[in-house]
Curated annotation (Swiss-Prot):
InterPro entries for the chain: Anamorsin, CIAPIN1, Dre2_N
Compositional bias annotation for Polar residues: 159-177
Single GO biological process annotation from the record: iron-sulfur cluster assembly
Residues given in the record as [4Fe-4S] cluster binding sites: C276, C279, C287, C290
The protein's assembly and partners: Monomer. Interacts with tah18. Interacts with mia40.
Segments for region (Linker): 146-203
Name of protein: Fe-S cluster assembly protein dre2
Motif Cx2C motif 1 positions after renumbering to this chain: 276-279
Listed GO CC annotations: mitochondrial intermembrane space
Region of interest called N-terminal SAM-like domain, as start-end residue ranges on this chain: 20-145
Compartments where found: Cytoplasm; Mitochondrion intermembrane space
Organism, scientific name: Aspergillus oryzae (strain ATCC 42149 / RIB 40)
Amino acid sequence: MSITIDTSVDIDLPTPPQSNGSQKRNLLLAPPSVAAHEEKLRDVFSTFDRSSTDLQMFDRLSAGFVSLPPNTYDLVLVLTDAQSDEAVRLLTRDVYTALVPAMKAGARLQLQQGSLGASEGLEAILAGLVEKDGGFEKPVQEAAVPLKLGGRKKKDKTNGVNGVQNGVATNGASTNGVGMFDPAQNNDDELIDEDALLSDDDLKRPLPRPQNCVPETAKKRRRPCKDCTCGLASQLEEEDRAREAKAAQDLNILKLNTDDLNDELDFTVQGKTSSCNSCSLGDAFRCSSCPYIGLPPFKPGEEVKIMNDMVQL
């Protein structure tokens, strides 16, 4: 009786396509004023390939609703319009904190129109970027090379093939004597005491101090008597009132009542928010983290239901 073993694969699963690591990926950051206009987004995607370009909103990135993959993007382009100061104003420290780790080494951050000013570019520099050609680049971290610190080996000067140095054989045991004196072993160098060079007058002389380092004499505030009649008590009270008024003016905070708060926000769907107002136009105008990815276009405000895996508009 012969036994045959079937070694063929029963289920042949298709191999998933591998992404090309050399393909450059782009990230577009859109403020609400740009994302709300369909024609502006259409012009942008006519320049960049949609398959290698991601679109994100400033407010979602700053609020932490979106997490960017690390070391992914080669170019980060900030979309601008006539109100370019809006995009610059939205480049806060929270945005740089989420954006810089997602940039590859050598990746570039730039505006679609114009460039960042000195004050706005300071946040980019503090985040680890380097200014270059009107934009900012993420520097390439060079690998540290360890240095070998060690003394150089002494070379024996021999004048023969048998290891004879200056007429003395070095192959055998060393001989103690005047001829074998090693100057390198003499570490008893004569040191000079620096304090012995100073005279008594030099030690009594005060140390010179720079003008800005001279300590000020402590001044105690005079306290008025319990039954003060000279006017010192009223003078100190005036100074205290002026100091409190100035502190209250510096800490002037705008306070809102409950009626002043905007109650038009709808929090019925937890985690599903939209800031670009272009979700109804289709996937071409939706950001990468849009909850409506894959759904057909619909009218703004129209209720969308999914019943039995079918979209009901």
